[in-house]
């Protein structure tokens, strides 16, 4: 509670970057970006491959069909005359614009120095003129380097007179407003007070210093009056001279020492009215105050229930006021008020009484809306109300009775970690901040684990086995391709992002780093500790295991590096070497053939301390940082099939590469946004390098193919008893990039992973041709598909709803997980058995395995098979069957 997760997110982000001095050096990132822009090899590589956006494109769906969330937004602003044009700002994902009410989105800030956006201002009569204040108001994921201006509707951006010297300051940009009467006046609030321009942003004056102003609004009819709410020295401040001078507003407000943060809202329904929302020092609800005389006098409207907590009735304490605090008032009714914190509450009487409007998981009978509201805003053109929150953007056109997620198309996901399949092309799984773990299976993204998603792995021999995790090392495993996950974690807590890896020759062996290194030899069913307090109770950050000798294992904790050569019986401290920097280790690489060759990557801003190499097993180290920029390196990966030992490095300024014959080159190639790269992985079957970014989603890059193609594939089912028969083909080819399928029935396809429907009985051979730069390969499976009315049917239920009509029923019926998997939670699905010409059906169960009744009950209270006497589930029920309660209807 009380913003714990938000703090841990920030700590995880900032700690490796400032270790060990604890000094934020945001200016270093800016300086290195400028240096890269001027360098000859900036954004260039031969051949000039480009990065491709992988997604998520649309908001990933949970098993219930509900949208999980795509990424955090700070701001929502509107066009002055067109209600269909919307602008949003993402703290790590940039400026986005929609001209069709959120159906489609485009961004134009990918190559700014820093793409974080805290707020946006639009000219009241010339919407081609816009301003953004850079950075992250609420979370600190990005720093602010000042205000940018657009003259072409947000297509391009230029610097203004307000730019922060980030080599010596670390300011947060919070709000930016344009005077609706005189648009040459620009008011900007920051963590260091208020700045004012009277010439359209060419020059700024610092008019209010030393106060962190996080909320700010103009009076709706008199632009000389501006209200501001602060965070720290918390109160409401007011200017009556258009932002030139500021004073604490009126009487009746709480003491500044009693409150943590304030938020302001005004309404055109009554220009004299202004509301102020306060969070207390516990980050819960302190009170809502109202002034009806332009802020001269204030009245407490309510101080309960706790509008900023997690519960459905406001009976809890605390909240996240320091991180999410939002307030808006209807432009047509001064008494309709919305408050946003973790959830959203609504009042119809000016904030005296409250009803829960939305809840972070849909509890209490309220609508579901993603947690953590950062801005609530009414559009005065159509009276729709919008929420910018940790999941994206929501809109209500009925004053909050219902809400719609319109975040599809916002590529703003903040990935922590990534796992790729080596058997199925483009199958990936990734852990994200705020929105859980996402699985991409071909074209679709699904939300498969909640919480904050962390490290992910897909078994390199079986794509149906995959792993995800949430904070502090709660590792989850799926054996059915991500349909369901269950915890396999040992009883310990790890780092916020806990490292774990599969053994590189036996995927049933798993290593997980907590304060001790745990090893499982049975896929996570049981664990043993193989260290002896080497970290002194501190938690591990990185792990790697030798592919050629699994007894050789390395792990790190901050700058400390440990190694075993005997499977954990004894450990040595490699960090005692004076040649290694005292910086957080962010990546460990052991060569797949020669375990004496080891690479390390480091975070921090120290000059030329990014990558170190050892060719003697860690006894000595060579600094190979070369021309790398002095910014944090976050991950490192080796191309294992490249004889030149090509390595790729993910940094706060994109991706760099080098091999044994070259120095470092940046391969952003004017296509990868200027964003933090948090993890890199190579998928050898597709020959792609995948980059998980912290703010712009997942990207891929085609690597040079150095081997001849190898064609191969598998199918989900090959024996059918009825028509039509649909087969899903999974391409497992390597070193290839184009394909031709011959399904044996006169039909072909060039899709990577096609689905084909056979219309006639028979046996069919299937051939796949796989082409690549170094040739073509083919494979044929003779008589692979067998369709005959005499076959025994093997039926797998759909994930939900109605499946196929079965005209023959001698065989096996599996739940959605198949023979070895688990079904979804709350899964209701069915098939219809309808043999041709039959007027009666007898079902004999030869083997039956469904969960038994619990709690001593004599009926099936959880999972069961139910049979209906008719064509659908509205027909009379013939009985429910589970485990010992079986029979033949």
Region locations from a protein language model:
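Beta-propeller blade termini and top-face loops
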Residues: 1-705
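A short, polar/charged loop/turn motif at coil->beta-strand junctions and beta-hairpin connectors
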Residues: 45-50, 67-70, 707-709, 723, ...
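Non-cytosolic beta-sheet module surface loops
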Residues: 90, 230, 604, 731-733, ...
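Short amphipathic beta-strand/extended segments with alternating polar/hydrophobic composition
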Residues: 300, 450-451, 487, 750-751, ...
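Extracellular/lumenal mature domains of secreted and surface-exposed proteins
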Residues: 705-791
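Domain-level representation of secreted and single-pass membrane ectodomains enriched
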Residues: 723-725, 769, 780, 788-889
């Amino acid at each position: 509670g009380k913003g714990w997760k938000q703090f841990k997110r920030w700590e995880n982000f900032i700690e490796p970057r400032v270790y060990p001095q604890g000094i934020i050096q945001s200016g270093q990132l800016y300086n290195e970006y400028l240096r890269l822009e001027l360098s000859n090899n900036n954004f260039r590589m031969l051949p000039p491959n480009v990065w491709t956006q992988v997604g998520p494109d649309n908001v990933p769906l949970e098993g219930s069909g509900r949208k999980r969330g795509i990424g955090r937004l700070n701001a929502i602003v509107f066009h002055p005359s067109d209600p269909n044009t919307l602008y949003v700002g993402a703290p790590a994902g940039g400026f986005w614009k929609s001209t069709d009410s959120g159906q489609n989105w485009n961004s134009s800030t990918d190559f700014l120095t820093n793409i974080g956006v805290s707020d946006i201002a639009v000219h009241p009569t010339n919407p081609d003129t816009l301003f953004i204040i850079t950075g992250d108001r609420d979370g600190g994921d990005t720093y602010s380097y000042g205000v940018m201006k657009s003259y072409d509707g947000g297509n391009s951006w230029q610097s203004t007179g307000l730019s922060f010297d980030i080599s010596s300051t670390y300011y947060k940009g919070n709000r930016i407003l344009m005077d609706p009467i005189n648009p040459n006046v620009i008011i900007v609030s920051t963590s260091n007070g208020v700045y004012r321009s009277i010439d359209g942003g060419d020059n700024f004056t610092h008019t209010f210093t030393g106060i962190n102003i996080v909320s700010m609004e103009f009076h709706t009819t008199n632009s000389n009056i501006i209200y501001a709410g602060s965070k720290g020295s918390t109160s409401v401040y007011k200017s009556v001279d258009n932002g030139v001078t500021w004073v604490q507003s009126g009487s009746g407000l709480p003491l500044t020492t009693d409150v943590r943060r304030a938020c302001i809202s005004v309404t055109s329904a009554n220009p004299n009215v202004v509301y102020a929302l306060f969070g207390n020092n516990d980050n819960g609800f302190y009170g809502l105050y109202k002034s009806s005389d332009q802020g001269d006098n204030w009245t407490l409207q309510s101080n309960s229930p706790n509008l900023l907590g997690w519960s459905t009735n406001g009976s809890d304490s605390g909240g996240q006021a320091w991180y999410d605090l939002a307030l808006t008032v209807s432009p047509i009714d001064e008494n309709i008020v919305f408050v946003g914190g973790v959830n959203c509450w609504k009042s119809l009487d000016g904030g005296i009484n409250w009803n829960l409007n939305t809840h972070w998981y849909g509890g209490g009978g309220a609508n579901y809306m993603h947690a953590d509201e950062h801005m609530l805003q009414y559009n005065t053109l159509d009276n729709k109300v919008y929420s910018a929150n940790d999941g994206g953007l929501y809109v209500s056109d009925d004053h909050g009775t219902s809400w719609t997620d319109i975040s599809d198309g916002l590529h703003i996901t903040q990935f922590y970690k990534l796992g790729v399949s080596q058997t199925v092309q483009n199958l990936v799984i990734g852990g994200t901040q705020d929105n859980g773990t996402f699985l991409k299976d071909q074209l679709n993204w699904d939300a498969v684990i909640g919480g904050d998603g962390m490290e992910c792995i897909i078994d390199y021999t079986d794509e149906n086995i995959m792993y995800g995790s949430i904070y502090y090392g709660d590792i989850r495993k799926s054996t059915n391709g991500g349909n369901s996950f269950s915890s396999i974690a040992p009883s310990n807590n790890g780092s916020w992002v806990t490292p774990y890896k599969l053994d590189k020759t036996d995927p049933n062996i798993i290593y997980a780093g907590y304060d001790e290194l745990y090893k499982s030899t049975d896929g996570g069913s049981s664990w043993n500790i193989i260290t002896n307090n080497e970290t002194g109770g501190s938690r591990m950050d990185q792990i790697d295991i030798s592919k050629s000798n699994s007894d050789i294992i390395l792990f790190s904790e901050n700058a400390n590096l440990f190694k075993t050569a005997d499977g954990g019986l004894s450990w040595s401290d490699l960090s005692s070497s004076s040649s290694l920097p005292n910086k957080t280790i962010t990546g460990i690489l052991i060569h797949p053939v020669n375990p004496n060759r080891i690479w390390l990557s480091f975070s921090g801003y120290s000059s030329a301390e990014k990558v170190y190499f050892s060719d003697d097993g860690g006894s000595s180290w060579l600094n190979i940082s070369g021309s790398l920029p002095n910014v944090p390196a976050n991950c490192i990966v080796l191309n294992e099939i490249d004889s030149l030992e090509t390595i790729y490095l993910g940094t706060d300024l994109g991706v760099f590469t080098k091999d044994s014959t070259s120095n470092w080159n940046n391969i952003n190639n004017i296509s990868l946004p200027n964003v933090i790269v948090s993890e890199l992985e190579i998928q050898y079957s597709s020959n792609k390098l995948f980059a998980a970014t912290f703010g712009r989603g997942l990207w891929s890059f085609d690597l040079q193919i150095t081997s001849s193609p190898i064609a191969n594939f598998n199918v989900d089912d090959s024996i059918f008893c009825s028509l039509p028969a649909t087969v899903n083909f999974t391409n497992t080819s390597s070193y290839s990039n184009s394909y031709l399928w011959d399904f044996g029935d006169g039909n072909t396809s060039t899709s990577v992973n096609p689905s084909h429907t056979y219309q006639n009985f028979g046996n069919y051979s299937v051939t796949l041709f796989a082409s690549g730069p170094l040739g073509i390969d083919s494979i044929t499976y003779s008589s692979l598909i067998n369709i005959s009315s005499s076959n025994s049917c093997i039926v797998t239920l759909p994930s939900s709803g109605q499946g196929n009509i079965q005209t023959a029923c001698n065989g096996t019926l599996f739940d959605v997980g198949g023979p070895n998997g688990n079904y979804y939670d709350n899964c209701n699905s069915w098939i219809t058995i309808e043999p041709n010409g039959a007027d009666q059906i007898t079902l004999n169960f030869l083997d039956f395995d469904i969960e038994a009744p619990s709690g001593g009950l004599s009926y099936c209270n959880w999972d069961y098979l139910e049979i209906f006497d008719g064509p659908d589930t509205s027909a009379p029920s013939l009985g429910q069957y589970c485990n010992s309660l079986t029979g033949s209807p």
